[in-house]
């Protein structure tokens, strides 16, 4: 499918697969509880784990981040360009749905330089959820063909290549700088 078709599916609160820096991600409208529940069911992922939100710039992520708890240095780190993808665990804004944060009082966000992420966010007007596109026990998909192989021929997938990152994103806590997952 092309960008316009995938953006329409996202606006209709469907789950889609799209390329990120290293692998294909499963995404949906983060403010649609029904879409997030479909995503969690598809991944067989417990709701208490929370989800990563991804966007091309901070503006898409601001509705979810408690910026009052961040200083200018932390905001700079959050928005900096890195040689590899970095996901930051940040204070969550009051009112952010629990179906996004899980059992945490924080939320994981990543500013992505992948052109597909930028285009989809621009077409939909919202950030995307991001969890690796793979069924439980199988490796993450690196091509649209692999997504179709795991999720079925008619699953909505954006035909566009993944980026050049070798591994999934590093995950760090922005307040403590604790490394949660190596990238």
UniProtKB/Swiss-Prot annotation:
Supply the EC number(s).
2.7.7.87
On whether Plastid is a keyword of this UniProt record, the answer is: no
Its main subcellular localisation, reduced to a broad class, is cytoplasm
Q: Which GO terms describe its molecular function?
A: ATP binding; double-stranded RNA binding; L-threonylcarbamoyladenylate synthase; tRNA binding
Keywords carried by this UniProt record: ATP-binding, Cytoplasm, Nucleotide-binding, Nucleotidyltransferase, Transferase, tRNA processing
Q: What Gene Ontology cellular component terms go with this record? A: cytoplasm
The source's domain of life comes to Bacteria
Q: Which reaction does it catalyse?
A: L-threonine + hydrogencarbonate + ATP = L-threonylcarbamoyladenylate + diphosphate + H2O
Q: Subcellular localization, per the record? A: Cytoplasm
| Name assigned to this protein | Threonylcarbamoyl-AMP synthase
Q: What is the lineage of its organism?
A: Bacteria, Pseudomonadati, Pseudomonadota, Gammaproteobacteria, Pasteurellales
| Name of encoding gene | tsaC
């Amino acid at each position: 499918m092309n960008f316009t078709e995938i953006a329409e599916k996202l606006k209709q609160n469907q789950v889609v697969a799209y390329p990120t820096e290293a692998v294909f991600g499963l995404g949906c409208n983060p403010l649609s509880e029904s879409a997030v529940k479909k995503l969690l069911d598809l991944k067989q992922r417990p709701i208490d784990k929370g989800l990563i939100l991804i966007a091309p710039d901070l503006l898409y992520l601001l509705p979810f981040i408690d910026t009052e708890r961040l200083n200018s240095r932390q905001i700079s780190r959050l928005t900096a360009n890195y040689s590899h993808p970095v996901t930051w665990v940040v204070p969550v804004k009051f009112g952010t749905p629990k179906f996004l944060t899980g059992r945490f009082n924080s939320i994981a966000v990543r500013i992505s330089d992948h052109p597909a992420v930028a285009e989809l966010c621009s077409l939909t007007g919202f950030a995307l959820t991001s969890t690796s596109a793979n069924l439980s026990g199988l490796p993450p998909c690196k091509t649209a063909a692999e997504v179709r192989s795991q999720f079925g021929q008619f699953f909505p997938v954006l035909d566009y290549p993944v980026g050049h990152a070798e591994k999934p994103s590093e995950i760090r806590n922005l307040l403590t700088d604790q490394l949660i997952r190596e990238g």
